[in-house]
Every structure is written in structure tokens, then in C-alpha cells.
């Protein structure tokens, strides 16, 4: 019987390299000016494209409108979205592969009651990058938290980031095996 081992040569190594090189945009790297919906989708698709190469329109205006209707993000002001809304949408786009929209709203509510939004967002970015490193490289998940103070809330962020990384790992390797649609 032939083994179903993925090709660990070029394709798998490229994939691993892409995941290890991925860097989340930090809060201060997001546009400081307000953006229209089409500019938001362009920015989000740009930020997320390294995680899902070749996937067109990872984020659409209809999705954004849905998140506003479900009160996961605040509605735009004069049809424009600010930096915080963009950061929230970025997190939603990552977390929606693992959690329901209701769960994402709850996660964000808990974090913003505990930490200023900018700090909570940047912490999620750091933890996601660490989770990608551990998941796609070392498989060592014992690295200490990057939180200045470990709390149940910071561990919730850390677990969420690990969930996203594990989902990406599973998705990517199923593709390499040729078993995912």
C-alpha cells in the first residue's frame, strides 16, 4: 500500500516557510486614516493573503456588513471605518475559522473589558505569531506567555491564537495530502 505522506520537499517546505514568516500587522501599522468598505476589504485581503495564498476575496463588503449587523464591530461613521474597526475585522477573519461569530464577539468583549483595545490586539498578534512558530516548526507549546501579567483573559487570547494556528496547520496539510476540497 502506498503511503499518503505529503511531499515534504518543495511544496511542504514552502508552506511551512510561509507560515513561519507570517507577521500580523500591529495596531500602529494599520492605516491611521478612515477607510471606505472597499479599501477595508483590500487591506484585509492583503494582510491575510499570506495565510491563504490564491484565495480571492477572503473578505467581502457583505461579510463586513454582516459583522456590523451582528454587533461584532461598530457601524462605520459616514461610511468609513477606523483603525480599531479594521483591527477587529482582522481578528474576526482569523478567528471565524475556529469560532462562531457569537463566540468571537464574547472573546472581544472580555478582552476589551480587561485591556485597552490596542494592547489586546497587539497581544493577540504576538501570540498568533508564536502559535504559528510552535505549530509549524518546533511543536513545542510550552513557551511562556508574552503577557505582562498572566491572567485567565490573557490565556483565553493565547488559546484562541493556538486554535487558529492549529486550524491552519490542519487545513494546509490536508491540502498537501490532496484530501481537502
Question: Where are these predicted regions, by residue range?
Answer:
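Basic helix-turn-helix/winged-helix DNA-binding cores
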Residues: 2-112
